[in-house]
């Protein structure tokens, strides 16, 4: 279980990047949504133990992640957008890095690389952006960490590779795993997610499973911005918004309105 308890963070000489974020995140795939500057990457860095909160806590199985205990760091992996991998090849990188993750599954890595059509002996610096991203995703998924944090994983992938990535995640995620995917393009993962995290100006507005979302919030499109909306984006002259659901019935999840 991943828990956020009144988590706050501010960069030097700047406004708060994250304000009083609280949530309990269980197993499954969660999409992390928000505009540029909303605080998505900051939140992922805090979850990964790469930043220290100004106040509050981020806990994994009850332990503060900021303490960076080796036993906790073995359970978390963060893959940033365009994050460099040291080593000339995937094989070489695995020899240097995978030893720190006891759950690493070399057969799964080989299987995913094969499905992506990647030779593990190929030089990383000779790969295209999309191929290098697929190699990195294959490695990240093969670690089988309890928490996997992916920042814009679909960037640089073509349509067929995005579809294959979805299939690979669905086939290999376990009930104990939590995968959090930061994305601007919900369509890339529209059939995949079990829950949503929505950030706006550093505020965590929504942190719920899909079942909870259908009861608590609604997705609307209107010619005027809805009063009291949790999130609003103007698209093609209309206002797509997430609002509180004040009715007695569940609403459908609108993937179009979620494309932030």
Give names to the regions the model predicted.
Residues 56-67, 71-72:
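Conserved ABC transporter NBD signature motif
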Residues 256-260:
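Conserved small/polar residues in nucleotide/adenosyl-binding loops
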Residues 48:
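Helix-to-loop junction immediately C-terminal to a conserved catalytic motif
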Residues 78-135:
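ABC-family P-loop ATPase nucleotide-binding domains
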Residues 148-152:
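Catalytic Walker B motif of ABC-type/P-loop ATPase nucleotide-binding domains
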Residues 164-180, 184-243:
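ABC transporter nucleotide-binding domain
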Residues 1-20, 25-26, 31:
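A short, flexible loop at the N-terminus of ABC-type nucleotide-binding domains that lies
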């Amino acid at each position: 279980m991943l828990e956020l308890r009144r988590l706050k963070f501010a960069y030097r000489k700047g406004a708060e990047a994250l304000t009083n974020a609280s949530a309990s995140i269980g197993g499954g795939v969660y999409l992390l949504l928000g505009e540029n500057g909303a605080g998505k990457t900051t939140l992922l860095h805090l979850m990964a133990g790469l930043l220290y909160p100004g106040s509050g806590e981020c806990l994994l199985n009850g332990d503060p992640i900021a303490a960076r205990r080796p036993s906790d760091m073995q359970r978390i992996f963060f893959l940033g957008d365009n994050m460099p991998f040291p080593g000339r090849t995937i094989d070489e990188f695995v020899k240097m890095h995978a030893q720190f993750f006891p759950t690493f599954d070399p057969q799964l890595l080989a299987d995913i690389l094969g499905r992506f059509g990647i030779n593990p002996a190929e030089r990383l610096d000779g790969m295209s952006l999309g191929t290098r991203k697929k190699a990195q995703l294959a490695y990240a998924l093969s670690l089988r960490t309890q928490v996997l944090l992916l920042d814009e994983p679909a960037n640089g992938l073509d349509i067929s590779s995005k579809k294959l990535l979805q299939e690979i995640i669905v086939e290999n995620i376990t009930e104990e795993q939590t995968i959090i995917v930061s994305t601007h393009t919900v369509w890339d993962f529209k059939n995949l997610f079990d829950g949503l995290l929505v950030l706006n100006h550093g505020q965590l507005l929504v942190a719920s499973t899909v079942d909870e979302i259908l009861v608590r919030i609604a997705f609307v499109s209107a010619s005027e911005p809805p009063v009291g909306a949790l999130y609003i984006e103007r698209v093609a002259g209309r206002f797509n918004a997430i609002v509180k659901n004040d009715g007695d019935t569940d609403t459908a999840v609108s993937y179009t309105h979620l494309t932030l």
